Amino acid sequence: MKFIAENLTKLRTISPLVQNITNYVVMNSTANTLLALGASPVMAHAKEELEEMIAISSALVVNIGTLDEYWIPSMEKAVKIASDLKKPIILDPVGAGATKLRTNTALKLLDIGNVSVLRGNFGEISALLGEHGKTKGVDSAVYDNNEALNISKNASKEFNTVSTVTGPIDYVSNGKEIYSISNGHEMLSKVTGTGCASTSIIGAFLAVEEPLKASVSGLVTYGISAEMAFEESFYPGTFQAKLYDWLYRIDEKLILEKAKVNRIDI
């Protein structure tokens, strides 16, 4: 898909500032992921500076991986500010379905503002739609290909957003059309925070593209980088380092050669 390659070039040209309210576990790796790709990360959580920080940012990433009584109000305020400023927002409902706190927080954030993209695994998005039993901790316990497609479509319509359900095959839907993406590698599941990193990558692409194609661009770019990284390293530690390298090295030519994307009309 030519638009994916073109979007990568646009992203690197402007190096968008991406404001992240993300979790303690992945903060460092997410920042390094964005830097390797060509974006500029900032991780600001204090309520007192959110308005100024979001005003100068190109997109807002909200990740609910480590919630507490301080972070939840910051997330709520950030989503409200970004909505008022018409900044694109991507929400990662980490662990939705595992606890009521996570599920209810994600649903409230979806209700507060105009979330551009909802990105989660099969179990998390299922839980937000009220289908229980598909989340194991923060990981998806059960994956069904056909059901994942339907969940992506249904979540988009339910929450009026682009819904991205990631798994062995990723599905991205705006309620009218769906893209399926087969890029990626199973080694990503052996490194913590790779799903969170993909969310932030989509956030960076939101600076240069509308939500549906930004999501496709982010997932394909990350997936191809993972495939190339595994060709050079078969173990989790060095795979992560190689993943940074390939996010830095990936270019338009490689995307055009290796993108595995199908567009599905609903």
UniProtKB/Swiss-Prot annotation:
<dbReference type="GO" id="GO:0009228">
    <property type="term" value="P:thiamine biosynthetic process"/>
</dbReference>
<keyword id="KW-0418">Kinase</keyword>
<dbReference type="GO" id="GO:0005524">
    <property type="term" value="F:ATP binding"/>
</dbReference>
<comment type="similarity">
    <text>Belongs to the Thz kinase family.</text>
</comment>
<dbReference type="GO" id="GO:0004417">
    <property type="term" value="F:hydroxyethylthiazole kinase activity"/>
</dbReference>
<dbReference type="InterPro" id="IPR000417">
    <property type="entry name" value="Hyethyz_kinase"/>
</dbReference>
<dbReference type="GO" id="GO:0000287">
    <property type="term" value="F:magnesium ion binding"/>
</dbReference>
<keyword id="KW-0808">Transferase</keyword>
<keyword id="KW-0784">Thiamine biosynthesis</keyword>
<feature type="binding site">
    <location>
        <position position="43"/>
    </location>
    <ligand>
        <name>substrate</name>
    </ligand>
</feature>
<dbReference type="InterPro" id="IPR029056">
    <property type="entry name" value="Ribokinase-like"/>
</dbReference>
<comment type="pathway">
    <text>Cofactor biosynthesis; thiamine diphosphate biosynthesis; 4-methyl-5-(2-phosphoethyl)-thiazole from 5-(2-hydroxyethyl)-4-methylthiazole: step 1/1.</text>
</comment>
<keyword id="KW-0067">ATP-binding</keyword>
<dbReference type="GO" id="GO:0009229">
    <property type="term" value="P:thiamine diphosphate biosynthetic process"/>
</dbReference>
<feature type="binding site">
    <location>
        <position position="119"/>
    </location>
    <ligand>
        <name>ATP</name>
    </ligand>
</feature>
<keyword id="KW-0479">Metal-binding</keyword>
<feature type="binding site">
    <location>
        <position position="193"/>
    </location>
    <ligand>
        <name>substrate</name>
    </ligand>
</feature>
<dbReference type="Pfam" id="PF02110">
    <property type="entry name" value="HK"/>
</dbReference>
<keyword id="KW-0460">Magnesium</keyword>
<comment type="function">
    <text>Catalyzes the phosphorylation of the hydroxyl group of 4-methyl-5-beta-hydroxyethylthiazole (THZ).</text>
</comment>
<keyword id="KW-0547">Nucleotide-binding</keyword>
<protein>
    <recommendedName>
        <fullName>Hydroxyethylthiazole kinase</fullName>
        <ecNumber>2.7.1.50</ecNumber>
    </recommendedName>
</protein>
<feature type="binding site">
    <location>
        <position position="166"/>
    </location>
    <ligand>
        <name>ATP</name>
    </ligand>
</feature>
